[in-house]
Amino acid sequence: MHERLTVENGLKELDVATKEFVTLFRHGTLEVELYRPRRVDRQQPHRRDEVYVVVSGSGTFFNGGRRQPFGPGEVLFAPAGAEHRFEDFTDDFVTWVFFYGPDGGEAPA
């Protein structure tokens, strides 16, 4: 585990890694990342469910054929296998990403 799970520490690691995301924590099926795409979000559907918690910035979230605006502090969910991406986002966009559960996602409650 990293020293502290903070946005500041995650951004420092992103700068060093020169990547759009960095994994900061893993436990069981839980994986915590910080994600900072540049200009275009190129992610593809994932095998597991994921939750985003927007740290900064705003834009549009495309998820399973639907679009919705997003902003700081917002929580977004993308089920396993769903086509999703961030669109028209501001230059300061950063989000926490929480992957969890089994491949294929969890069954709806």
Predicted regions and their residues:
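A short, N-terminal "cap"/entry segment at the start of jelly-roll beta-barrel domains
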Residues: 1-34, 39-44
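Short histidine-centered beta-strand/loop micro-motifs
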Residues: 22-24, 40-46, 63, 87-88, ...
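Short hydrophobic/aromatic-rich beta-strand segments that constitute the beta-sheet cores
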Residues: 32-34, 61-63, 95
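Short acidic-glycine-tyrosine-enriched beta hairpin
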Residues: 65-80
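A structure-centric signal for secondary-structure junctions around beta-strands
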Residues: 29, 48, 92-93
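Ligand-binding loop in jelly-roll beta-barrel domains
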Residues: 80-106
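Short, charged/polar surface micro-motifs in flexible loops or helix N-caps
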Residues: 28-30, 37-40, 58-60, 101-105
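Short, conserved beta-strand element in jelly-roll/cupin
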Residues: 46-61
